[in-house]
């Protein structure tokens, strides 16, 4: 029987995402100047205030206030009427040295024996319902907000947009678990106070449907069939009406509160650990990326149509407690999920140091992950600039989203005898 499934996303200007982006900007700066830095950084943003707190073990000393201001500036909080503005907000730092008790569980004489930074379980998921092996509802929800932010920055077709926004997409699936149509789209965007509430609502609704949606269809042709007009999509645009007060002034934001937006939109599973603000010694982050890498390569290799991969750790122990695989009955090989897991365990070294090396995670690559999802993004090589506390500028050439590479497809096919 057909069923509905929904996923949501939030924009870079959403308060929780502002916090994530500040935390990850600090991670990047520490790693740029000290690749061996151990960092756990949490951020709180509210009306006119930013609070930074966390633990650090590093040789680098940073101007954390200026780094935070630059992130806020880049997002677009640059006007005093937002009640949260890059140049004038107060920034309090309570960042201190990492506990020696925690560090002794991670550091080892041999790097290969580096222990997990904490206990826990992490999940990776992939499906062939989109070209980037991500759930379609989440992919669409992200794309809506990416293009909405682009329209805001361009400031031509829609001039009243402010940084805070949310989207939600509901899809109908058929009996074979394939998406067949979009049932509903919910989009709420912060905006200037430019007319009466009724006129603003009508204008925003019209612009989203007549400007944003055609832009999505034009830029992402693969989604054209879902907007062909054959089935009526229910649109709920700013359903509460006026949305002038938003961002950190409207809601307090915290690092790590959008973990489902960051991953698979409710598909698969989540171990509960957030990513942003954590260096790669924290397996909450590194192992989640590694399991996504495994899942994506398994599906791309034709092993299955959909897969969930779990790995678990004990703090201070390098070898995982176990690896679990669930192909949801879609496996194309004559092996059960337990047998598949055994081969996966041999194929992918899941010790923390091995993950760091395989995915090049000791590089400043995290700011780009902090909005619009950590998964399903395009791997690319970029050159990034970082400014030290004494004004020194260094440039780093890094590869982003390495866990999205399909570099193990041939190895998977060989290991499972897939032709």
Swiss-Prot record:
Annotated residues for binding of K(+): 42
Chain positions covered by the region annotation Flexible loop: 98-108
Top class in the EC scheme: transferase
Cell location: Cytoplasm
UniProt-annotated binding residues for L-methionine: 55, 98, 251, 282
Cofactor binding: number and manner: Binds 2 divalent ions per subunit.
Pathways per UniProt: Amino-acid biosynthesis; S-adenosyl-L-methionine biosynthesis; S-adenosyl-L-methionine from L-methionine: step 1/1
Any GO BP annotation: S-adenosylmethionine biosynthetic process
Entry GO MF terms: ATP binding; magnesium ion binding; methionine adenosyltransferase activity
Leader sequence residues: none
Gene3D superfamilies: 3.30.300.10
Chain's role: Catalyzes the formation of S-adenosylmethionine (AdoMet) from methionine and ATP. The overall synthetic reaction is composed of two sequential steps, AdoMet formation and the subsequent tripolyphosphate hydrolysis which occurs prior to release of AdoMet from the enzyme.
Protein name according to UniProt: S-adenosylmethionine synthase
Species of provenance: Cytophaga hutchinsonii (strain ATCC 33406 / DSM 1761 / CIP 103989 / NBRC 15051 / NCIMB 9469 / D465)
Upper lineage: Bacteria, Pseudomonadati, Bacteroidota, Cytophagia, Cytophagales
């Amino acid at each position: 029987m057909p069923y509905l499934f929904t996923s949501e996303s939030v924009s870079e200007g959403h308060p929780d995402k502002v916090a994530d982006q500040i935390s990850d900007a600090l991670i990047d700066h520490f790693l740029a100047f000290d690749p061996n830095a151990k960092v756990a950084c949490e951020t709180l943003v509210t009306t006119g205030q930013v609070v930074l707190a966390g633990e650090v073990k590093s040789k680098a000393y940073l101007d954390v206030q200026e780094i935070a201001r630059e992130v806020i500036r880049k997002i677009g909080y640059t006007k005093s009427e937002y009640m949260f503005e890059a140049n004038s907000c107060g920034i309090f730092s309570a960042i201190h040295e990492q506990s020696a008790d925690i560090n002794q569980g991670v550091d080892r004489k041999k790097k290969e024996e580096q222990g997990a930074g904490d206990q826990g379980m992490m999940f990776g998921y992939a499906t062939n319902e989109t070209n980037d092996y991500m759930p379609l509802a989440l992919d669409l929800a992200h794309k809506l907000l990416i293009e909405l932010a682009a329209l805001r920055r361009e400031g031509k077709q829609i001039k009243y947009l402010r940084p805070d926004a949310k989207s939600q997409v509901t899809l109908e699936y058929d009996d074979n678990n394939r998406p067949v149509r979009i049932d509903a789209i919910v989009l709420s965007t912060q905006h200037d106070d430019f007319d009466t509430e009724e006129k603003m609502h009508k204008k925003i609704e019209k612009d989203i449907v007549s400007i944003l949606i055609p832009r999505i269809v034009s830029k992402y042709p693969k989604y054209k069939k879902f907007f062909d007009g054959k089935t009526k999509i229910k649109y709920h645009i700013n359903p509460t009406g006026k949305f002038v007060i938003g961002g950190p002034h409207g809601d307090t934001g915290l690092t790590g509160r959008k973990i489902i937006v960051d991953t698979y939109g409710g598909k698969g599973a989540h171990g509960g650990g957030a990513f942003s603000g954590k260096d790669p010694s924290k397996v909450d982050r590194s192992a989640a990326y590694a399991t996504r890498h495994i899942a994506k390569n398994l599906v791309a290799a034709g092993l299955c149509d959909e897969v969930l991969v779990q790995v678990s750790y004990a703090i201070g122990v390098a070898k995982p407690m176990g690896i679990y695989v669930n192909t949801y009955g879609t496996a194309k090989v004559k092996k059960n999920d337990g047998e598949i897991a055994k081969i996966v365990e041999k194929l992918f070294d899941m010790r923390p140091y091995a993950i760091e090396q395989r995915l090049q995670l000791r590089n400043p690559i995290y700011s780009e992950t902090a909005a619009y999802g950590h998964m399903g993004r395009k791997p690319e090589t970029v050159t990034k600039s970082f400014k030290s506390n004494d004004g020194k500028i260094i440039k780093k050439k890094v590869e982003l989203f390495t866990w999205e590479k399909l570099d193990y497809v041939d190895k998977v096919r060989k290991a499972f005898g897939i032709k």
